Amino acid sequence: MKRIIFLMLGWGLCLIVQAQTTNFSKLNFGCDGSSTTSGNQWSKTVVDLLGFASHHNVAVGSSTFACHPDTQDYNSDNFAGISDGWKPTKDKKELQMRHNNVSKVHIQKFISEVKDGVYPAPDVFVFAMGSNDTKLDGVAEALSARTLDDVNVTTMAGGARWAIQTILENFPECRVFVWLPIPVSYTHLRAHETGRNL
């Protein structure tokens, strides 16, 4: 079901971007997300169908917008790496790598790869994540922070604000699209299940 929704959203993105320009061969595509975006999934299909010049995807399964208190910066000297692991473990390095699997670190990696010339600067960037986030509070705080240094990145809203604004500040000509999951209450889920069983 999630793949169908993302494919529909991807097709919608294609239509929006196509309305703005007809020649995608000179445009570069970047994206960040979780498991539904990682690798060569919907984003690669969009790039191939529309003929974008490049595809730069830093999405990793199990990722979140919200950082952990011990999340490391991508360029820090002791950076442990990033892991999409999800099975229970007590391995300290693996746990640190999982705590680094957040949009802030992905975006730091993305910018580093662009600055190093590995990939070109993006003309279109899509964030497609949030389904793994559990810290959904802090929206007002994230929006009212004056600078990125003031943003509390340990919430979904703060992490999203930091990531989106960082892309816009580093690539001001880039068009940014954000696809978030639509949260559903437990009551709604139970009603849906009850209706489906009738």
Question: What do these predicted regions represent?
Answer:
Residues 1-20:
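Bacterial Sec-dependent N-terminal signal peptides
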Residues 51-56, 158, 171-174:
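Structural alpha-beta junctions
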Residues 156-163:
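A general structural detector for well-ordered alpha-helical segments in enzyme core domains, enriched
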Residues 188-198:
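Single conserved hydrophobic/aromatic residue that forms the stacking wall/gate
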Residues 126-136, 140-141, 163-190:
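Active-site segments of SGNH/GDSL-like serine hydrolases
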Residues 45, 49-50, 166, 170, ...:
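Alpha-helical structural signal in soluble globular domains
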Residues 23-150, 154:
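Conserved SGNH/GDSL esterase-like catalytic core that processes O-acyl groups on lipids
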